[in-house]
Amino acid sequence: MLFVSLCKARAGTPKENIARRAQWQYPEGTQPVAEYWLQTTDPTVIVISEADSIAPMMSAVADWDDVFEFTVVPAIAAEEGLELAKQMMQG
């Protein structure tokens, strides 16, 4: 299952946060698909991850909730969404 995390900066300096990120590893059970660092404040970071459940996402949020305000939502790729739409229209 794909999850998209929208991360809004809360505290800390970019230098501190980058140093912290360099040492941090994604939780076990999480496969990062993409991580984007934006030149905006909301969101500051977008992460797309794959996991079997929400549990690893909750762990990542707990690791970073002092630095970012999170919105985590399940997502599907456009191709999968189009296939599901075709199935719904047929049934």
Question: What kind of feature is each model-predicted range?
Answer:
Residues 1-91:
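Conserved, structured core segments of small domains
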